[in-house]
């Protein structure tokens, strides 16, 4: 659990589409949810613009939101991996997911 929380505290969010650096100006006016179909409460309740503002204002809430999001994302990822292991198609699922999840948004 160290990696998701440490990266979250530094403004890096893991999503189903790739990695978001919340400190980038790109997110300043993006009022869409952190992750519309995310697994946690914070994913739909806070916008990327608001979270970016919290990071730049050095609010502790930013660290909490990012950590909760990343932990929920990793729980989702492990559940998905488990489903594909049981289904017997993990070896085809893994390379596709690694490529998708390592994309910088």
Which positions does each model-derived feature cover?
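Glycine-rich phosphate-binding active-site loops on the catalytic face of alpha/beta enzymes
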Residues: 1-14
């Amino acid at each position: 659990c160290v990696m998701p929380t440490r990266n979250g505290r530094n403004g890096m969010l893991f999503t189903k589409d790739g990695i978001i650096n919340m400190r980038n100006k790109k997110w300043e006016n993006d009022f869409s949810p952190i992750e519309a179909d995310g697994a946690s409460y914070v994913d739909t309740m806070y916008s990327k613009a608001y979270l970016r503002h919290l990071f730049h204002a050095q609010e502790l809430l930013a660290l909490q939101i990012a950590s909760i999001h990343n932990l929920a994302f990793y729980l989702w990822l492990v559940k998905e991996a488990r489903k594909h292991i049981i289904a017997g198609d993990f070896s085809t699922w893994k390379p596709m997911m690694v490529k998708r999840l390592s994309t910088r948004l």
